[in-house]
């Protein structure tokens, strides 16, 4: 029962059809949880999919209640070490979790709920979960500021530059991991400041991450 809030119209039939497909794709995948696809039996709440779609989702529909409920589930599934599961709900209880871009849904989704609707309550609700995820990434680095020693990254998933049979692209997984540490930490700092939290530790980490990333 989400209210439609975003509309688009243009004179190009193909562009217009693409937009309509996006709307129907969201409608088909926003049933109780944000799923990855509704046309096959898997239908799991893959965190990576909503991470990249959250901004669009919050523009198309009034999706804050839907996403905040799912974020509560995400925090409940989060491992003690801060790793975020690759699917929420975590139906399979996989041992290897915490992939960059997938786990970053725990920061990126609250960010777009906050930015689109001006909702600071989502920051307060998810603050500890977001903090645990940032600290988890920090703990998995060859030096402080990198996220490059974790052994579970999907990387540039389904990119075609590595050939038709490959599931991941040619971009180094650790490069993507460290880039997402920088990205999510920047969003986390902005949100923390919005609710009056002291973010000095994470600002220092952000500066170190930039330097370490450029050096590597």
PLM features per residue range, with description:
Residues 114, 182, 188-189, 206:
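Heptad-repeat amphipathic alpha-helical coiled-coil interaction surface used
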Residues 90-98:
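Aromatic/His-enriched, Gly/Pro-containing loop or helix-boundary segments
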């Amino acid at each position: 029962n989400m209210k439609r809030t975003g509309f688009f119209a243009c004179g190009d039939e193909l562009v217009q059809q693409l937009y309509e497909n996006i709307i129907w794709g969201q409608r088909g995948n926003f049933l109780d949880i944000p799923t990855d696809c509704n046309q096959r039996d898997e239908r799991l709440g893959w965190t990576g999919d909503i991470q990249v779609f959250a901004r669009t989702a919050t523009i198309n529909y009034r999706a804050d209640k839907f996403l905040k409920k799912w974020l509560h589930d995400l925090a409940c599934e989060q491992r003690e070490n801060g790793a975020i599961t690759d699917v929420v709900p975590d139906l399979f209880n996989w041992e290897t979790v915490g992939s960059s871009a997938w786990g970053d849904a725990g920061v990126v989704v609250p960010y777009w709920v906050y930015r689109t609707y001006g909702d600071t309550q989502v920051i307060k609700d998810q603050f500890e979960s977001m903090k645990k995820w940032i600290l988890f990434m920090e703990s998995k680095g060859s030096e402080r500021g990198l996220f490059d020693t974790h052994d579970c990254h999907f990387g540039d998933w389904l990119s075609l530059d590595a050939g038709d049979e490959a599931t991941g692209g040619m971009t180094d997984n650790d490069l993507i991991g460290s880039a997402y540490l920088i990205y999510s930490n920047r969003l986390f700092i902005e949100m923390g400041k919005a609710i009056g939290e002291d973010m000095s530790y994470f600002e220092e980490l952000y500066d170190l991450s930039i330097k370490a990333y450029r050096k590597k």
